[in-house]
Swiss-Prot record:
It comes from Arabidopsis thaliana (Mouse-ear cress). ATP binds at V75, G76, H77, G78, S79, F80, G81, V82, V83, K98. Residues 69-353 form the Protein kinase domain. It catalyses: L-seryl-[protein] + ATP = O-phospho-L-seryl-[protein] + ADP + H(+); L-threonyl-[protein] + ATP = O-phospho-L-threonyl-[protein] + ADP + H(+). Keywords: Acetylation, ATP-binding, Kinase, Nucleotide-binding, Phosphoprotein, Serine/threonine-protein kinase, Transferase. Its EC number is 2.7.11.1. The gene is ASK1. Binds to KIB1. SUPFAM superfamilies: Protein kinase-like (PK-like). Roots, shoots and leaves. This is Shaggy-related protein kinase alpha.
Length: 405
């Protein structure tokens, strides 16, 4: 493996490199199928101006290539580690580097997932490398495409202005969220498990949305238990609050339904202060779940006595001028029974998104909409022809020549 190092500044590169992976990591077989091997860098800096030097290529007769990243600023942090914005000194390209502490005993599930993903509405992995600290802690660095905004910040922006988000943006963002979910659920078999406005990146010029942060993502296997204490509180599906361990990708659909409601309202629909409080907030809107609905979420709770509360009509939650299609879609996504929630692909053909299929649809500034109909064959595999005809409007069919429509 190539020797790589860290340089404190462009003029004085440190010569100390790490020539090989630690012994325990030889079993990890980490390979980047974009012709980029996971290399190791020595050092751990995210301070502004810090330069990280790594090597890519060198396989299948490919020339080795040195890439240097200069850390610019921290853009996010959490229990996982830190995300910082960096610039590639060779190309001038801005990237995001997510740095996570790596347990040497295990493969990194996020890296494995990211390598499978290739979609216009999912953030892409460019490269990855390892770095070590003085204490010999190992960090995995995921070099990702940089997208400057988040849906969370866009919501805050409109709140500050005391305005409702223009409906065209609500439709655009929600459509792209469900297109990303349809892809990861149907094509990859992965459940994201942490859909929330902070994990939805937005390009403020094109309004293209990209799903990010696959740190909680997992392939759900029928019959295999999963942890229920995942997903951020306001967006947690009720079956997770009930402690279900055999849930499905419908938990992402619930979360995305909560995001849609928040885009329409300007604030979270279910702002619970704790797990139990979260359930109370849901019951206040959906009413007390029936015995049958409880059984669908977690059979262990069917005997539990819940306060009997009537459902609050959806049209009273949203203002009078709210389009009925918007209210209808929210009601189809936020169902207690996971199997009754609209699947991500079915959601894309909902009438709420018909405006996006209009050949004359434009952004408020007159620009074209971002690409919405450039489906790849695997995205629509097994989809009935009449549904495909709805998903790919006539004016966009040249983007999918493989369809033969």
């Amino acid at each position: 493996m190539a020797s790589v190092g860290i340089a404190p500044n462009p003029g004085a590169r440190d010569s100390t490199g790490v020539d090989k992976l630690p012994e325990e990591m030889n079993d990890m077989k980490i390979r980047d199928d974009k012709e980029m091997e996971a290399t190791v860098v020595d050092g751990n800096g995210t301070e502004t101006g810090h330069i990280i030097v790594t090597t890519i290529g060198g396989r299948n007769g490919q020339p080795k290539q040195t890439i240097s990243y200069m850390a610019e600023r921290v853009v996010g942090h959490g229990s996982f580690g830190v995300v910082f914005q960096a610039k590639c000194l060779e190309t001038g390209e801005t990237v995001a580097i997510k740095k996570v502490l790596q347990d040497r005993r295990y493969k990194n599930r996020e890296l494995q997932t990211m390598r499978l993903l290739d979609h216009p509405n999912v953030v892409s992995l460019k490269h990855c490398f390892f770095s070590t600290t003085e204490k010999d802690e190992l960090y995995l660095n995921l070099v990702l495409e940089y997208v400057p905004e988040t849906v969370h910040r866009v919501i805050k922006h409109y709140n500050k202005l005391n305005q409702r988000m223009p409906l065209i943006y609500v439709k655009l963002y929600t459509y792209q969220i469900f297109r990303a979910l349809s892809y990861i659920h149907r094509c990859i078999g992965v459940c994201h498990r942490d859909i929330k406005p902070q994990n939805l990146l937005v390009n403020p010029h094109t309004h293209q949305v990209k799903l990010c942060d696959f740190g909680s993502a997992k392939v759900l296997v029928k019959g295999e238990p999963n942890i229920s204490y995942i997903c951020s509180r306001y967006y947690r599906a009720p079956e997770l609050i009930f402690g279900a361990t055999e849930y499905t990708t419908a938990i992402d659909v619930w979360s995305a339904g909560c995001v849609l409601a928040e885009l329409l309202l300007g604030q979270p629909l279910f702002p619970g202060e704790s797990g139990v409080d979260q359930l109370v907030e849901i019951i206040k809107v959906l009413g007390t779940p029936t015995r049958e609905e409880i059984k669908c979420m977690n059979p262990n709770y069917t005997e539990f006595k819940f306060p009997q509360i009537k459902a609050h009509p959806w049209h009273k939650i949203f203002h009078k001028r709210m389009p009925p299609e918007a209210v209808d879609l929210v009601s189809r996504l936020l169902q207690y029974s996971p199997n009754l929630r609209s699947a991500a692909l079915d959601t894309l053909v909902h009438p709420f998104f018909d405006e996006l299929r209009d050949p004359n649809a434009r952004l408020p500034n007159g620009r074209f909409l971002p690409p919405l109909f450039n489906f790849k064959p695997h995205e629509l595999k097994g989809v009935p022809l009449e549904m495909v005809a709805k998903l790919v409007p006539e004016h966009a069919r040249k983007q999918c020549p493989w369809l033969g429509l």
